[in-house]
Amino acid sequence: MTEPTGITELLLSRIRDVADYPEPGVVFKDITPLLADPGAFAALTDALAEAAGRTGATKVVGLEARGFILGAPVALRAGLGFIPVRKAGKLPGATLSQAYDLEYGSAEIEVHAEDLTAGDRVLVVDDVLATGGTAEASLELIRRAGAEVAGLAVLMELGFLGGRARLEPALAGAPLEALLTV
């Protein structure tokens, strides 16, 4: 087997397609083989940490749940603080929350009220950009906390779902970086 040469090839070679999951007709992009490969995981972490540096971020927000897996090591590698954005009801103490619409219903995310303040420049990190609903809510939450959005960085963008177009107004000029687009 030939070893992949560039980061794009390396990352793509470690993402497994799972047909008909979680429902028939869906092809799930499973990143667990990438996470299990220390070289690929380190390359991913380095690439996202470089994005944090380019944006001038002072903190990294990770979106529940796989955004935690990627965001925490990115923050550590970049020398920044890590802030988890969780589903409603998962954080103790005072929180700020943001509701957003789903295809069928709504959801809510939260952050500790004291974790983001004026002067913070925040990079949002997640595994996949699909429709952009959760990311859009996180950008609003960051701004409501008084912080500035430095950008959004994801491992993979599912371009056919239109998340980038949805996020353009919410990004307000902040960059959106996807290492892979499928």
From Swiss-Prot:
It is found in: Cytoplasm. The keyword Glycosyltransferase applies. Pfam families: Pribosyltran. It catalyses: AMP + diphosphate = 5-phospho-alpha-D-ribose 1-diphosphate + adenine. Homodimer. This is Adenine phosphoribosyltransferase. Keywords: Cytoplasm, Glycosyltransferase, Purine salvage, Transferase. InterPro entries: Ade_phspho_trans, PRibTrfase_dom, PRTase-like, UPRTase/APRTase. The lineage of its organism: Bacteria, Bacillati, Actinomycetota, Actinomycetes, Kitasatosporales. Catalyzes a salvage reaction resulting in the formation of AMP, that is energically less costly than de novo synthesis. Signal peptide: none annotated. One of its GO terms (molecular function) is adenine binding. Disulfide bonds: none annotated. CDD domains: PRTases_typeI. Its EC number is 2.4.2.7. GO terms for cellular component: cytoplasm. Pathway: Purine metabolism; AMP biosynthesis via salvage pathway; AMP from adenine: step 1/1. GO terms for biological process: adenine salvage; AMP salvage; purine ribonucleoside salvage. It comes from Streptomyces coelicolor (strain ATCC BAA-471 / A3(2) / M145). Belongs to the purine/pyrimidine phosphoribosyltransferase family.
